Amino acid sequence: MDSKDTQKLLKEHRIPCIDVGWLVRPSASTSKSSRPGKSESKANSVAPDIQMDTARPPVFETSVDSSSSILSSNDKGRRHSVAASLLMDNQRANAGSTSVPTNIPPPRGRSKSVVETNLSNVEADSGHHHHHRHHHHTEDAPAPKKVGFFKSLFGHRKKDQEQQEKERERKERSPSPTHVDRGAAIRRERTATISAESPPPLQYNAPPSYNDTVVPLTRSKTESEVYYENHPQSYYHGRMRTYHSPEEGKVDGTSPADDHNYGGSRPDPRLMDFLRYYKSKDYKLAAFKEGNFIKSSASPTTKKNRRASFSLHNDKPQPAKSLAHQKFDAKGRPIPPHPDAPKLPSAFRKKHPSNASIVDTVDSNSDVSSSAQNNNQTPSSHKFGAFLRKVTSYGNNNNNSTNASSLSANVNNPDTSSTSLWSSSSMEFDPSKITTVPGLENIRPLKHVSFATNTYFNDPPQQICSKNPRKGEVEVKPNGSVVIHRLTPQERKKIMESTSLGVVVGGTGQLKLLNPEEDDANAKSKEEMAPQKQNEVEAHDEEDNNSQRRNIVMAAAEAAAEARAKEAPNELKRIVTNNEEEVTVSKTASHLTIDKPMISRRGASTSSLASMVSSDTNGTNADDEGEILPPPSLKIPHDIVYTRCCHLREILPIPATLKQLKKGSTDPIPILQLRNPRPSMVEIWSFSDFLSIAPVLCLSLDGVQLTVQMLRIILSSLVYKQHFQKLSLRNTPLDEEGWKVLCYFVSKAKSLHSIDLTMVPSIKTNVQKPSKSSLKSKILRMQCNLENRSDMNWDLLTASIALMGGLEEIVISGAKMNSAQFKNFILVACIATERLGLAYNGLSKSQCDDLAKWMVQSKVTGLDVGFNDLNGKLSSFTDAVLGKIQKANEKNVFKFLSLNGTNLRVNEHDTFENNEVLKLISVLCYLENLKFLDISNNPAIFPHCVPTLIDFLPVFVNLVRLHIDYNNLSSTSVVMLAEILPMCSRLNYFSMLGTELDLASSKALAEAVRKSSSLMTLDVDYVYMPENIKEKISLYALRNIQGELKRVNSDDKDIKDSQFSSLQDQLSLLLTEKADNSEHYNKMVENFMAKIALARIKISKVVHDLFDLKLNGQLNLEGKEALIRLCFIEASLERGCDLLKQRHNNTLKSPEAVSKSRKGGNQAQPNSESCQRMLLSSSILQNSDHIALMPFGSAIVEKSSPDAEDAVEFREGDDSNVNHEDVPANDQQFRDEVDIKNKYSIIKRELEHEKLVGGGDLPVDKEILNRAAQSLDSDQIKEFLLKNDVSTILGVIDELHSQGYHLHHIFKKQGNQEETAFRTKDEQQSSQSNDSSANASPTTDPISTGSNTSRTNDNAHIPPTDAPGFDKFMNNAEENAIDAAYDDVLDKIQDARNSSTK
């Protein structure tokens, strides 16, 4: 065929195609080639981007078959292969809309010519078009052949039927009769030049993706896995192209398509449809768990079997055919279409649903669908395929045929099935019928073979290689060369004596089948005739006798063997070998010992099992009738199970894993960590064997580098576990394939509650240092971006979580998703999430808005947004909290909030009305269940945030844990916070790391622990704290722990809290409880406001008198402490009233107005007893338990257990404060006893003093109060004011006033000259220290232990620690420091009061 004919055909818009009928038709017409002779040429192919021009009639490329070069004379076998047949079938299908001219000569079968491909550029007015123009060079046609075997195999339909079929297909694909867009399918097809001498592999047309690739022909099973691992899938073909809108890349029309790119690939449109379907459920969890998408899910599909057959177009999608499409048999007769749905139920047995859904059937790249399509197109190929399946199929032929028929029905006519993923009316993708997330169809199911636990009753006998094997004569060098070293008998003897022979483990089983039945019967009769054992001593003696008897038998056997060897003839003693010296094994070498196990305590494992069996059988004989070994209900300890799992894999147990298992324990394992950062495959297998049967609640793979296969093995052992709850993958590398495996696991693991996918390099993981052998390993492990997980396909994980019903806890720190992915994740994946970790995510304003919207709609209890720049973005969270409060008939369950390192700022004159941080703190008071608050690493909010914290912290009645770490607090701020801590009635944990403490702040913290009855943990930098203050804090913490244990163990529910329980609980109740009965609720609020007004009147009068006394310089230290406490109480009550007014839209009366109305209407003011009768109680405040699974939750005090083995050790620094004059120098035990007695006496005095002043649960004793007032004991009066409720404080003030005593008289300095001189000296020292502190840091204080320079300069003023007056000096120094700090606090309070009155 010359170039003129080609040009003529192009002008007629007809695409020629080589007719391959010469393979089977003997009467095929022949013609001479335009270029006679055998020629070899190289083909040049260029693949520019092709664009269609609608103005000019399109010019199509010629689709010329290259089988003439492939089926060359040098390779006759390729003509008979299935690849050739499939190639011709697919070529007929690709030439669907073209007419085949009859004057094209067929090529010769033995021709070595190649197909040359040229391109002609056709330019139009609107654009440039590039099309392939092929020039074919053929030779003389072969002689006619007889009808043979290929006639029946490759018989094809008649040409008129083929043309009719192709015309129908073209009309179906065409959007209109006048416009045929065939360039979309042609522009991605490429032709390749194949050399005749050394032909490369067959080329096939890749699927229409965004990155066109050409993949060589491989087996369909291997190719489909390799191709889809490295190339993004695309589903813009068939009917789906008409379904998606032009804004397919946008999600809800808000985000561009570029936001969904994952590593350069565009999103899957089916996945976007899937997410849109879930978002249409309007945030209702019931719609996900019990909605229509599960009820109408796709029917179980048959399992897809991959056959090892060749396929040319595995990945080429086939257009869906309409219902009107007719099929024809071999004789051209039409085949009626299959009915839409059967009228009767199926008679076949239903199979279990496989992981592959029907979507996988439509878009699968396996040869099953390809062969099914080819079978429907060409009946003759079906015969040849059936012939090959008998030879090369690896599965069941019946299943293959069933799958092929079902797949062909689904592929060719997807509208016929009622359970299809395609809508019958519009051919749209239906996400409601999905059983597998789009994009995970090709993931193989996770399967793991596990044994029952009692299988490990018998330790499997294994021979484990020695750790120090003996060296042999053969040495293999790294370059592959082999060197043989001849050893002398002396060298061999030395090696045998100095090396071990490995470890023999196992063999402790009691298998009855090992003994014949006759021997068992004889043994039974002998045991029945034998007398029973009298005691354990006789049993032990018998065991010794048995061991001695065995040793005697072994020695006799050895002696007999040596005697036989001596009596044997010489020619039998020696085995002659070629040029090899005789080697004899000495007696020493024959008795070599074996390696010892790495864990010594595992030696008693078998005995423990034997003891358990004996205890279970209650002394009965082990060989009794009906006894089953191993016992079916026997619980084997976890350490033994793991050891035997390792023995099954012929390795010793890994110590890092074995140490985490408590010896002899069968309880559920809270957490199990894989601590080897680069584990081997055998370690993974043994670890997964143990995971599959052990009750592990949480698995940590933090910082472990795995391969995809290793990850599959581990997840396969967890996917079907019933009680597995959490999977932690912090800083674990995951590539694209590993991410898909993880998503598949999440979609299938029904018991999974929590997942941690943190990727933050600064977070440390609990892994070991990698070994040298693991570093030298060449195993290709997963690699990814170690800074964050921004390149992961988060939409795929979103769909996986949504499909399994949601997760309770999700931690994705360092995810850094874009806006579209984040919105999908929050609105779809977190629909059932209660705890969400979003640290290190770089949240934007729009993402914060989406998160706040989700908070209002969800049941979230904990939120971590740490290390995100939230400056100017907190208004969304504030509105979300207010929105949750305003929701009717729903309880606010928010408990945990972390704002760690969020770049928050508070200026000097900001208030909660104009600053978002202060407003959020005030709004958090409405959360009655708030237990955890973290505002660490925000130094810009201090010190101006301290007054707001002081005002609102007492309102947080259920606050359990507070963190303000690394905020560079000043000493005055620390003292103010320490004074407010006792007012937090349930605060158990207070952390203030990163703050340098001076003597005053240390003393204030110690007093805070002493005044509080709930504070048990004070987490500060104790390096700046003197030793005596450390001891006091430890003693006060022990006292509080004892009180908490007493409260837990007590059955009396009427015990009230000792710290402001009445007013605080009442205020919290009024702020948070729903006003179901408006009249009753308003009456409660009015009574509370009246009580607050009366309390503020009395407290303000006392505060005014004490401030006047301070201005005159007559207020003592106890008075200053009481004054600070009263000021904080007054401010807290005022803030509570403001919050009540804000909630009721300022309709309530102010406390002053209420007090005036009460005074005018009723002269008699209610006393303290009547105030106590007005207290409210609510059941809401009783249920305030912490969630144990939270990473930042505090420990719950539980009842003591006799099996508890952990103990808390309180370390003491030195014993310099204890007088050891009468103690021997070397008697350490006696010194410890003295320390314990001293500490116990201190605790006893503290408890007695509390009982004396009415602390704890005892009421106030009026007689003791009168005696204290008469003696002007200011310290005891202060304890009355600090250790009781506000209403009790009011009663104390009224009682003192009735007796004629006033607080400004009691807290006035006494006229003692010695005390006055001491105070004067103290003021001078404090002024000097203040002057020096202006130019130095707090660590340069003379008393501080953190500065060596200050010690050397002030050495003369500090007595030695072993001096008799050291304790008195330190006490005076502490009082002086805290007195100066109290003055600073009172000055600031006075300034704030003056500024508020202006």
From Swiss-Prot:
| Modification sites for N-acetylmethionine | M1
Which intervals of the chain are annotated as region Disordered?
A: 21-77, 90-144, 156-186, 191-210, 244-270, 296-382, 395-428, 515-548, 605-630, 1148-1169, 1203-1223, 1313-1372
Locations listed in the record = Cytoplasm; Cytoplasm, Cytoskeleton, Spindle
User: Is DNA repair among this UniProt entry's keywords?
Assistant: no
Q: Where is this cross-link: Glycyl lysine isopeptide (Lys-Gly) (interchain with G-Cter in ubiquitin)?
A: K221
Q: Tau/MAP repeat-like: where is this region?
A: 1227-1258
One GO cellular component term:
cytoplasm
One GO process term, biological-process aspect? fungal-type cell wall organization
**Record-level Gene Ontology MF annotations:** structural constituent of cytoskeleton
Q: Which Gene3D superfamilies match?
A: Ribonuclease Inhibitor (3.80.10.10)
Q: Where are stretches of biased composition, namely Low complexity?
A: 63-73, 357-371, 396-426, 605-615, 1325-1337
Q: Which residues carry this modification: Phosphoserine?
A: S81, S309, S311, S354, S357
Against InterPro entries, the record matches this protein to:
DRC5, LRR_dom_sf
Residues that bear Phosphothreonine: T222, T577
Ordered alphabetically, the record's keywords are: Acetylation, Cytoplasm, Cytoskeleton, Isopeptide bond, Microtubule, Phosphoprotein, Ubl conjugation
User: Which stretches does UniProt call biased (Polar residues)?
Assistant: 27-36, 91-102, 114-123, 372-381, 1160-1169, 1338-1355
Q: Where is the composition biased (Basic and acidic residues)?
A: 159-186, 521-538, 1208-1223
Describe the function of this protein.
Answer: Essential for the formation and/or stabilization of microtubules. Binds to microtubules in vitro.
State the remark under miscellaneous. Answer: Present with 279 molecules/cell in log phase SD medium.
What's the protein name?
MAP-homologous protein 1
